[in-house]
Each structure stands twice: as structure tokens, then as C-alpha cells.
């Protein structure tokens, strides 16, 4: 209702879930105000990372997109922001991802900013309750950066999720996609 009444979606989310952002190093001023930028970030918390990234980008520029699981486009407030990725390992999924990368490159060449989690899924641990790590970067990200000529700005989210979520995440490949 608040968003329908004109409030900023990202601010409503941060307030509603009482999210506190603590910048340890750097500044939002380090994100270029103009020109193509790719924000790369680790993915320790799942959905929360995308919401935080959206909030951060909304504070710096209006021309941003986030590459994320296509399911998030079902939320009408995110439809214009999300560049959808498919995790289906079939022809349809591959075509979706190629189209998304091409759309992201066009958006970047137009001077926009795109946020991405280069590992593609939420950090997970090799052994239950060991330190979770992001997966290796996908070629998707390197191609996006190289073909767009964008400036790359890293963002690091410190911390990790609860022991209960670690257990669920360790046992569910599907959960890592959100």
C-alpha cells in the first residue's frame, strides 16, 4: 500500500524489515554517477542481498537493473528492475540467459548500471556448518563486463546466514537460487 501511495519501494523494504546498513569501507560516492557500471557482489544471505543491492543502487542512481532469478519479475514493483535469469539447464533457459545478457549489454551501453551476483547462487559451504563461499564466477559476468566496457565496482556484504538456513541451503540446490 505504501508503494502504491508513492513511497520508494526500496526504502519501504529496508524500513519494514528493520535492515541496517553499515558501510565499513568506501562510500556510495564511489559508484560513478554517469556511464555504464557493473556492480558485482557476493551473495551470502539470499533474497536479502538483492534487496540490499536494490536499495544501495536506488540511493545512487535511477537508471539501474539487477540480474536475478526470473521469479522476482512476478512482483510488479520489481518487474522494471529485474533482468531475469533462468536456472533451467535446457534450451529455453539458455536462450533466456543469452537474451538477458544482451539486454543488459544494451542497457549498459546506454549508460545504465547493472548489479549482479557473479557466482549465480547463494554462498554455500562444502561441509555442513563450515564457512560458506560464493561459487566461482560464471562466464556470463565476464562476457557482460567485457562486451559492455563498463566500470566494475565491487560491493561486499559481510556475514552469513543462520545455522538453520545453512542446513537447509546445504541440502537444497533450489534454495541457493534465491
Task: Indicate where each model-derived feature is located.
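A cross-family acyltransferase "interaction/gating" segment
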Residues: 113, 125-178
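Catalytic core of membrane glycerolipid acyltransferases/transacylases, capturing the structured
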Residues: 38-94
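Hydrophobic/aromatic ligand-binding patch that stacks against planar heteroaromatic rings
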Residues: 56, 106, 143-144
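A structural motif
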Residues: 110-121
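Surface-exposed cleft-lining segments at the edges of enzyme active sites
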Residues: 86-96, 124-132
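A short secondary-structure junction signal
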Residues: 50-52, 77-79, 118-119, 125-130, ...
Amino acid at each position: 500500500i505504501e508503494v502504491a501511495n508513492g513511497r520508494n519501494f526500496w526504502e519501504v523494504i529496508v524500513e519494514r524489515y528493520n535492515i541496517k546498513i553499515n558501510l565499513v569501507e568506501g562510500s556510495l560516492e564511489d559508484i560513478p554517477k554517469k556511464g555504464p557500471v557493473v556492480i558485482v557482489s557476493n551473495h551470502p544471505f539470499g533474497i536479502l542481498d538483492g534487496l540490499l543491492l536494490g536499495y544501495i543502487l536506488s540511493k545512487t542512481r535511477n537508471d539501474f537493473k539487477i540480474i536475478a532469478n526470473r521469479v522476482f519479475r512476478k512482483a510488479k514493483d520489481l518487474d522494471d528492475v529485474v533482468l531475469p535469469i533462468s536456472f533451467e539447464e535446457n534450451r529455453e533457459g539458455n536462450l533466456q540467459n543469452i537474451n538477458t545478457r544482451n539486454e543488459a549489454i544494451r542497457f549498459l551501453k546506454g549508460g545504465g548500471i547493472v548489479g549482479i551476483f557473479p557466482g549465480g547462487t547463494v554462498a554455500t559451504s562444502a561441509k555442513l556448518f563450515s564457512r560458506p563461499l560464493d561459487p566461482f564466477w560464471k562466464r556470463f559476468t565476464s562476457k557482460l563486463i567485457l562486451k559492455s566496457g563498463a566500470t566494475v565496482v565491487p560491493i561486499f556484504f559481510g556475514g552469513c546466514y543462520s545455522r538453520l538456513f545453512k542446513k537447509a541451503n546445504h541440502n537444497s540446490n533450489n534454495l541457493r537460487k534465491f
